[in-house]
């Protein structure tokens, strides 16, 4: 999973509402291996991370949805996919020169919110792994829903003399 996966799914500026884990019991101070982590967005879209013992094969789809599957090398099962892609509008141009964005005050392509949402995704998985259970998340408040133990992992006390 990476930034482009969320970009392709149109999920750059939001977070999943649920994270499910299939993993052995974790050490309380570290996250180890997992078999599967499933992130689900409010529209039902999922990102699945396969872990320990999973080996990607040629028949493993990179993206899978109700209309078909896309594999490595853009091989896919979606009928007439190239014609359908040609009908789509070009994406908005992105500002990829960071220094130019600083000078002109324009938004950088991979800005702080996208970076924050990337970190949130990873940290949601880490929290679910440490607690070894499904967690529900509110992408607006950016807190786990009805779960004090999970929320304590979001904002852990810092060791002295460190503070924010």
Tell me the role of every PLM-derived stretch.
Residues 8-9, 13-164:
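Glycine-enriched catalytic-core subsegment of oxygenase/oxidase enzymes
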